[in-house]
Each structure stands twice: as C-alpha cells, then as structure tokens.
A protein has these predicted regions:
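Beta-propeller-forming repeat regions
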Residues: 18-415
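Bacterial N-terminal signal peptides
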Residues: 4-16
Length: 415
C-alpha cells in the first residue's frame, strides 16, 4: 500500500448551472485514466467520505491524500492494456460499488471489471496499512449497466447483471452474496429462461438495465430496453420472473445505460427514464399509464431542434437520479462518455464531453418537463456517474471517473 499527496487541489468553477441557485464547483482529482466508474464512502472511518476510482482512494474532506488499496494492474496486452489508454483502450474498473459486505463496520469495494470478467470484492482491512484482500466472487458478470441494490428485501444488496457461458447460456438475473462469507462465491439467480434468443440478447456487452418498483407492489423489479420483469410474490423457488414487454428504445436502438425508475409526473405510478443508445443519440422518459402501458416523452434526439433548449449530445452511457435543487422532485444527471469506442468509433466522439443535470418541472396542468442544466463541458460521464453528498452539507454532489480523469462536482452554497 502506498500513500501519496496531491501537490495542489485543482479547482475550477464549472459552467453555470443555475436553477434555484444550483451551481457546481469542479475539483480535478487527476487527469489520468483510472476507471470509468467510481464509488463514495467513508473507507477510513474518520467522519469524512472518500472517493475510490480504479485502485486509488482519495481521502476526504479535501481529497488530497491518496491510498492505493490494491496494486496497479499489470496487463501486457488486451483491451485494458496498462497503462490504460483513453484513446484506444479500456480499464479494469468498469463500475465500482461501496458497501459493508461483511458487516464489520468498514466499507468494502465491489469492482465490476470489464464485462464478461469476474466481479471482485476487496475487503477493507479495518484501517490497517496493507493491501485489501481480493476475492473473485462471481465468475462471469455480463452487461454494461449492472447495479447494486437490495432485490430480495433482506437488507443486503445484490448485484443485478447478466451472465453467460456454455452451461448457463445468456441469462438476466442477480448475484446473491453469501451472508455468512461474502468473500466466497456468489450464487447467480437467473430470472429469464435459457433460449437461443436470450443467448444472443444477454451477453457481455448488452446495454441498458435498471431496477425499481415498477408496479407499486413494494418489490424491486428489473427493467431492460425491451420491457420489465416483475418480481414474484416469493423468491423461495428460484423461479423465472413474469415479463412485460415494453419498447423503451423506440426505433430499435441498442439500449442505453442505467435505467431509472421513479414517479416523474406525480400520479403515483413509477415511470422510466432512459437513454436510447449508449453509443449514439436519444434520451426520454416513459409515462406509465393507468392500464400499465407506457407512453414515450422524448427529452433529447438526434438534432438540437429536438430539444426546446437546443441540447444534443451523444454517448449517454451513465445516468443517476437525485433531487439536486431540493424541491422534493427527482432530477437526474447524465452526460457524454468521452471516447466510448475511441477517437473515431461513435457519432461525434470528439465533441465536448458535457455533463448535465436535468431538472424536473411539473406544471399545474399535469405537464412535465426536464430542463437541461449544463454543469461542465470538459468531463462528461463514464459507464457510471455517482451521486453522493461529499461534504456533508445535505446537498447531492456528483463524482465522475472516465477517460478524461476523475472529478468531483460539489454544489456551492446558495448566493
């Protein structure tokens, strides 16, 4: 384990994002390509939250002290050849999650490696200055938009993702960690059948998935670009989940990123917010009607004129929800994933890597709008964007790790 200090904090005022005096201050933690996902937790239990991206923890409250909780990867070849190349390659840290998995009071780190690789658990050594123990807990974690959420309702989060292989085929489901021994092998519980169609649909690079209570029965359901899977009354038999087809990607797109489930219009029914193509264009929300069907409401399209504010950008590869302006309504954040497929691989790969939050506004007539608020035009998102209160002021902040570097966007006090 190595400790080091950042010579100076690099602070810049992000481009004004003013809605009810919401303005963000940008802190550059590093310009190195470390990861495309990150997590936030108080790893050292000093009362201040920390940021982890790649193999490094930046310690709060000023994030100038660094700890390597595990040695850097040494990959002589492959898509994640080291040092990680932002223009041509990827990293071994696609997404990252923090949770006290072993119940000892110290947050651990779950690393979702490249899709199709093992999911890794790094166990916190309870403040000791030594490398964290590393455990491969799930042999093949597929999909590009997994999540960590308590699906079973037992208070312990599961990793919802996909998995594939000769024996399993392509299946959607969730990996359950062993409560008695979280560092042991997790058990995958598929919710879809094995079919030739699913073998092609659910594989390492499948895009677009999320989790939330779609039908209001108090149980967590799973959504994909093709519809949603209803959690049954009981999970005891390990059976398949009923599927409700919905085209959440109009026009047959490849699918987006994290799909958000919350009540947009205030009618008491859960709606869905999603990007349409993680490597192209499109963003929208889908209103759930009283009969359970969904109606599309486009937010962004392929042209600036598709949005009232003229906003248009590509590669919306990460979304996260939060009430940024404190009005009691759920907003969300997304942006452009810089060089998702390199410098020439996707539409407009070299356009400004923007980061936006979308303010939810409800009208008295029942109308709804998501107003885009530009936070920054030199960062964007990775395959994950993390929302957390990094300075304990009660306001949601934003943390990003991607091919541009690692950033914190901290809300400034009003006025």
């Amino acid at each position: 384990m190595r400790l080091s200090m950042v010579p100076a904090i690099v602070l810049a005022l992000a481009l004004p994002a003013v809605a009810n005096d919401v303005v963000f201050e940008k802190q550059f933690l590093t310009e190195r390509f470390m990861a495309e996902g990150c997590a936030v937790a108080d790893f050292d239990r000093d009362g201040h939250v920390d940021v982890v991206a790649g193999n490094t923890i930046w310690h709060g409250p000023d994030f100038t002290r660094l700890t390597e909780y595990t040695p850097p990867r040494d990959n002589p070849a492959g898509p994640a050849k080291t040092p990680y190349d932002p223009a041509r390659g990827y990293s071994n840290y696609f997404l990252m999650f923090a949770h006290d998995f072993d119940g000892d009071g110290w947050h651990d780190i779950l690393v979702y490696d490249l899709p199709g690789e093992p999911a890794l658990l790094f166990v916190n050594p309870r403040g000791e200055a030594k490398p964290w123990s590393k455990h491969a807990i799930f042999a093949r974690a597929d999909g590009e938009s997994p999540g960590l959420i308590d699906i079973t309702g037992d208070g312990v989060p599961e990793l919802f993702c996909q998995s594939s292989g000769p024996e399993l085929g392509g299946r959607l489901g969730f990996a359950v960690l062993d409560k008695a021994s979280p560092s042991g092998e997790a058990t995958f519980r598929p919710i879809t059948p094995r079919t030739p169609e699913n073998d092609k649909k659910y594989f390492r690079y499948t895009h677009g998935s999320g989790a939330g209570d779609v039908n209001g029965d108090g149980r967590v359901d799973i959504v994909t670009k093709d519809g949603w899977f209803e959690q049954p009354d009981s999970l005891d038999d390990g059976g398949l989940w009923p599927f409700h087809p919905v085209d959440f990607v109009p026009g047959g797109g490849m699918g987006g990123a994290q799909m958000l489930v919350f009540d947009v219009d205030g009618d008491g029914r859960s709606d869905v917010v999603t990007s349409y193509n993680a490597h192209g264009y499109g963003l929208g929300w889908f209103r759930q009607e009283s009969d359970g069907s969904f109606t599309e409401h486009r937010i962004l399209g392929k042209r600036p004129e598709d949005n009232p504010e003229g906003v248009c950008f590509t590669q919306l590869h990460a979304l996260a929800a939060a009430d940024f302006d404190g009005d009691g309504l759920t907003d969300f954040v997304t942006g452009k994933r810089r060089w998702a497929h390199g410098m020439k691989g996707d539409p407009e790969p070299n356009a400004a890597p923007v980061l936006y939050w979308f303010r939810l506004v409800r009208g008295g007539d029942g109308g709804v709008a998501f107003e885009p608020q530009l936070i920054d035009d030199d960062s964007g998102v990775g395959t994950q964007v993390t929302v957390a209160d990094v300075n304990a002021d009660g306001k949601p902040d934003i943390v990003v790790a991607n091919k541009r570097g690692v950033f914190i966007f901290r809300q400034k006090p009003a006025g």
